[in-house]
Each structure stands twice: as C-alpha cells, then as structure tokens.
From Swiss-Prot:
Residues 18-28 have a biased composition (Basic and acidic residues). It catalyses: dUMP + (6R)-5,10-methylene-5,6,7,8-tetrahydrofolate = 7,8-dihydrofolate + dTMP. Belongs to the thymidylate synthase family. The lineage of its organism: Eukaryota, Metazoa, Chordata, Craniata, Vertebrata. This is Thymidylate synthase. InterPro entries: Thymidate_synth/dCMP_Mease, Thymidate_synth/dCMP_Mease_dom, Thymidate_synth/dCMP_Mease_sf, Thymidylate_synthase, Thymidylate_synthase_AS. It comes from Homo sapiens. GO terms for biological process: DNA biosynthetic process; dTMP biosynthetic process; dTTP biosynthetic process; methylation; negative regulation of translation; tetrahydrofolate interconversion.
Length: 313
C-alpha cells in the first residue's frame, strides 16, 4: 500500500466522465420563451382587446437572454432578421414614415400607416404612412413638437439615444441610463402607442446589459422580434462604447397570446430549440447613426420553418 503522498498518478477520465465532471451547460435560452407560451396557454385569462381578436393574457413575466457569443434569434421558427435590422435602423434614424421602411421590403408598419387606419383614428389630414411621434421620434427628439413625418427636427427635443451612449462612456455606473418611448403628451398623436416602452442599460465587468419593460407583448408575433431588436441595440451600443454584450432582460406587462395564434404556437412548442446564431459586426463604427444594414452578419442561423400567424391590427 503506497504511503501518503506517493499515490500513483490517476488515469485520465474518459471523455464521457470528463463531461460529467464539467460545469453543467446552462439551459437553452429559448426554453424561457417556450415556457412563457406554455404558461399562458395553461394559466392565461381570456381578455378582450383593442383589435377585437381576443387574447389569453398573463400579467408580469421576465426572461434573461445571454448575449455572450450568441444572439437570441429564436430557432423554433424562422424570425424575420431583415425586418428586425431595418426597423431598428429606422428607429435610430428617428423616422416615423412607414413608407420608408416599406420601401426596403419591411411591411410590418404598413397596416398602421394605411389611409383607412389613420382615418379611423381621426388623422384624415395626415399623409398616408405618417405614424406620428412613435419610437424613433421619442428616442431622438423627446419633447419636441411633432408636425409631420417630413419635417426636420435636428437639434429639437432630447436625443435620448445619444445621451445613453454618452453616459455609458463617461459614467458607466450611473443608474439613470434610460431611454423611454412613452410620452403621455404625444400618445394621442401616435398611430400606435409604444408597446416596448422603456429600456435601461447597465455596465459591469466591461459588459453592457439591457433591460426592456414592454407594457404589451404579442407573444406569437411581436415578442420574438422584440427580443432580437433590443439584443441588436445592445450589441450596437456595446460596439460603440468599447464594451462586450452581457445580458438582455425582457420584462413583460400584459403578455398575451391572440386566440388565432394558439394553434400555430402549439406547433412551435413541439419543436426542439437549435443553437442560437452568432452576430458579427463587420467594421468598426464610431457613431450610432453610421451603422448600415450591411455592417451586420448573422452566422449559423438554422431555424425550423416559418410558422404563419396573422397580425392583429
């Protein structure tokens, strides 16, 4: 029997045993979204809504998605990446013209900017496509007086987005790094009040994280889009400020499933998540306004097929 300290060297563990001894891998981030869908289907309360479609609704949900070397573009159905990217660039530009986005092949705001829809809200003198002071206007010109989608608002109102970036650079421990699209004075002028209303940024260990408060979440169509959009915004701001992306925390108020989305979502729940893709920014960009669609590349996105769901207007 060997004396203490003279034990023979241990044989290396076989690969399977090494895996067992290693740190357990965290569960796939998409399982949080699928779990939210299951919870709403099981526990949601039947509620009427503005669109007349009807929903199952739960109040108050949260999920946390890692942005470290992965990008939360859901895989249990194909998410319209071009739409996510072009809409965010359109917000950053401060545009409120739905036709501008539509001209790039992204039609997601067409219904809310249509002649019939604007007329139904009493905006009969407003040009078709003019959504009013929605997200982009509030991000870049909060407090300015809105006239129309063609006016030049340079230097007017508070540029919340640039203020966020400047504060991250100069005072990253600040607890007030907030951007808010909910402007009570302007709500009556909007074709659609903001669903994703407020986001806050947080810096620690050279990582940038973002938490979004979304007052209203269409779980089938909108929420997968919103997750990717604010994850992308976090990547962009991290790039400009010399930080690494950390987490995206998604807090939902009224989390709902439209009744006509129940069957499509049951199909989605039967699918196994695949690895999230990676997002590459292909050149060094110094200013948020200088980003272009061709600066971004999604790698390794291998989703399940598209699932058709109708938008409630």
């Amino acid at each position: 029997m060997p004396v203490a300290g003279s034990e023979l060297p241990r044989r290396p563990l076989p690969p399977a045993a090494q895996e067992r001894d290693a740190e357990p891998r965290p569960p796939h981030g998409e399982l949080q979204y699928l779990g939210q869908i299951q919870h709403i289907l099981r526990c949601g309360v039947r509620k009427d809504d503005r669109t007349g479609t009807g929903t199952l609704s739960v109040f108050g949900m949260q999920a946390r998605y890692s942005l470290r070397d992965e990008f939360p573009l859901l895989t249990t159905k194909r998410v319209f990446w071009k739409g996510v990217l072009e809409e965010l660039l359109w917000f950053i530009k401060g545009s409120t013209n739905a036709k501008e986005l539509s001209s790039k092949g992204v039609k997601i705001w067409d219904a809310n900017g249509s002649r019939d829809f604007l007329d139904s809200l009493g905006f009969s003198t407003r040009e078709e496509g003019d959504l009013g002071p929605v997200y982009g206007f509030q991000w870049r010109h909060f407090g300015a007086e809105y006239r129309d989608m063609e006016s030049d608002y340079s230097g007017q109102g508070v540029d919340q987005l640039q203020r966020v970036i400047d504060t991250i650079k100069t005072n990253p421990d600040d607890r007030r790094i907030i951007m808010c699209a909910w402007n009570p004075r302007d709500l009556p002028l909007m074709a659609l009040p903001p669903c994703h209303a407020l986001c806050q940024f947080y810096v620690v260990n050279s990582e940038l994280s973002c938490q979004l408060y979304q007052r209203s979440g269409d779980m089938g169509l909108g929420v997968p889009f919103n997750i990717a959009s604010y994850a992308l915004l976090t990547y962009m701001i991290a790039h400009i400020t010399g930080l690494k992306p950390g987490d995206f925390i998604h807090t939902l108020g009224d989390a709902h499933i439209y009744l006509n989305h129940i069957e499509p979502l049951k199909i989605q729940l039967q699918r196994e998540p695949r690895p999230f893709p990676k997002l590459r920014i292909l050149r060094k960009v110094e200013k948020i306004d200088d980003f272009k669609a061709e600066d971004f590349q999604i790698e390794g996105y291998n989703p399940h097929p598209t699932i058709k769901m109708e938008m409630a207007v």
